[in-house]
């Protein structure tokens, strides 16, 4: 009987130690990012979500912030987002991560949709008022997002080479330029009526 009691106590001790261990280990993954004093607060949140500081994610966030503000939404639950563009694969598809961070719309909540298209458009609809804002990037924003060389291949040893480090630094520099672009350089923001938004969505996806 005493042996059984000791085993029970030991079992519970192991259980609680395991729970404490799991609780202590619960944390988000560490992104590849060194914060700089001039970085806006939203950039740090975007990097935490995306994993590193890249120009396409930064571009998506900037353009989506502008559209969200123009539509008059608070974000997360009071909006629907439609994104159009050539985002089938990275690095361009990283744009979609930036949009999710900036609007709070996510695929889990089913309030964001991507439609393949040649031209980039971010369309935000305010669910409370019906107001729709459509954002299209400027040539300057697109030029910044695309002006980097492909990442060099990883060496057989798996170690980061000096060339890879330079590539990452270039990406981060471009992303920071996008983060600090004047609002008027981001692109055009147009306020649409719901019927106009539906028509434009169909036209631009063709």
Regions found by a protein language model. Give the residues of each.
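Bacterial N-terminal signal peptides that target proteins for export
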Residues: 2-12
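Non-transmembrane, aqueous-exposed alpha-helical and coiled segments at domain scale
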Residues: 24-53, 59-206
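Bacterial N-terminal signal peptides
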Residues: 10-20
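Leucine-biased recognition of intrinsically disordered, low-complexity hydrophobic segments
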Residues: 6, 21-22
